């Protein structure tokens, strides 16, 4: 009996049969959705009822009121750190005025989540989508303090819908993922595996080109074309952020105050970074390491496809591998990056619950430790508290384990059918 089988046994003993049956009904998921979202709405009401915002939405509100002309920023953080389509939800949230900015921002994300849940639990997934939907709600309970206050909350449900339909409608998925990439870059880590695994990869590629052309045209017409690629360079000189996986050695050097190592704020980009022997070299190397990791993942995907891997499983596990690599080999490592993994796991669980329950458990552990880090005890962490350093280290180790799992399973997809005739590419 596996660990997960034991959990099911415990659940059956603890919960009455009627309760278990209720959780298996499609309607129960919507009740759960309402409870989770009403909780976060109530919590955020303590801010927006006073005309305040929470976390990054304060920066978004400032951009929405000040505009997007870099010449008018006067040393402030540039809004062009995000791809240009992020401007749409950022400005839309100001439609009811600055005092209700947080409320409108929350409602936008809640609406997108509702659409994502609808697609997850309709048609052929009316039954198989229920358990993944509950997993999503529990994940949101831990990550909601981040997802309802970050652009990631906008992109995550869009990526989920794209993954749910990538097998049967890859071009539609390509369009959705391309749009999401122009809001926040990370969906590109999902678009690449979908393109590799799809029989319609050429059409998927040109759907992305078409979206990019429309975005470029719109940006040119609005007078911002000169800044359309600023998001690729605006943060290029930043150091190793505290939460990044590869920052872990300097976190502990800071805890024990070895060789002048420390954690300090980078006020220019509003982040906390680690400083110490070799930290600058590590920051310089992270970009090429990330590129190499992405190339290695792409090669592994192509290899598996040529050996007859099942396409839907390939782009799902490939997406998990690529997105996790984007996090592990990233010198930023912000807590909200964990949100990126949610849509991939949810789509994977809907495709094959048994195969995906291990990474789902790993990600839930990552979400729990991230919740302890932010919003609960971020201040002790930036003051080098050893207990919080241990929590962060645990989170980072779990991320590495998740990356290892995804690489291993993707490689296995390529080995299972070595005798099969290669698929038409």
Residue spans for each PLM region:
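Short hydrophobic/aromatic helix or loop-helix immediately within or flanking a transmembrane segment
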Residues: 62-65, 76-99, 240-278
């Amino acid at each position: 009996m596996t660990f997960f089988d034991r959990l099911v046994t415990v659940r059956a003993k603890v919960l009455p049969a009627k309760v278990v049956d209720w959780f298996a009904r499609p309607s129960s998921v919507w009740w759960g959705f309402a409870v989770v979202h009403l909780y976060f709405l109530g919590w955020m009401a303590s801010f927006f009822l006073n005309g305040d915002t929470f976390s990054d939405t304060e920066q978004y509100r400032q951009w929405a009121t000040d505009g997007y002309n870099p010449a008018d920023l006067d040393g402030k953080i540039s809004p062009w750190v995000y791809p240009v389509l992020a401007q749409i939800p950022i400005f839309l949230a100001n439609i009811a005025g600055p005092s209700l900015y947080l409320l409108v921002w929350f409602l936008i994300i809640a609406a997108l989540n509702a659409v994502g849940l609808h697609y997850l639990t309709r048609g052929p997934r009316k039954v198989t989508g229920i358990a993944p939907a509950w997993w999503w709600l529990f994940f949101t309970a831990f990550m909601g303090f981040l997802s309802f206050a970050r652009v990631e909350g906008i992109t995550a449900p869009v990526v989920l819908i794209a993954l749910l339909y990538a097998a049967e409608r890859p071009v539609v998925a390509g369009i959705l993922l391309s749009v999401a990439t122009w809001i926040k870059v990370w969906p590109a880590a999902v678009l690449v595996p979908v393109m590799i695994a799809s029989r319609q990869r050429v059409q998927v590629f040109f759907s992305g080109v078409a979206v990019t052309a429309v975005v470029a045209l719109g940006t040119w017409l609005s007078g911002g074309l000169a800044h359309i690629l600023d998001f690729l360079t605006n943060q290029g000189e930043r150091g190793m952020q505290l939460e990044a996986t590869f920052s872990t050695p300097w976190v502990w050097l800071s805890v024990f105050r070895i060789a002048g190592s420390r954690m300090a704020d980078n006020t220019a980009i509003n982040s906390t970074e680690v400083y110490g022997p070799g930290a600058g070299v590590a920051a310089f190397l992270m970009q090429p390491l990330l590129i190499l990791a992405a190339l290695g993942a792409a090669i592994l995907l192509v290899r598996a496809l040529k050996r007859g891997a099942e396409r839907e499983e390939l782009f799902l596990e490939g997406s998990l591998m690529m997105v996790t690599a984007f996090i592990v080999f990233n010198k930023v490592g912000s807590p909200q990056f964990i949100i990126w993994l949610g849509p991939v796991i949810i789509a994977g669980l809907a495709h094959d619950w048994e195969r995906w329950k291990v990474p789902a458990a790993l990600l839930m552990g990552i979400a729990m430790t991230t919740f302890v880090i932010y919003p609960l005890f971020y201040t002790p962490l930036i003051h080098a508290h050893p207990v919080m350093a241990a929590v962060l280290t645990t989170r980072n180790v779990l991320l590495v384990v998740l990356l290892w799992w995804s690489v291993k399973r993707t490689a296995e997809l390529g080995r299972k059918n070595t005798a099969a005739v290669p698929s038409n590419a």
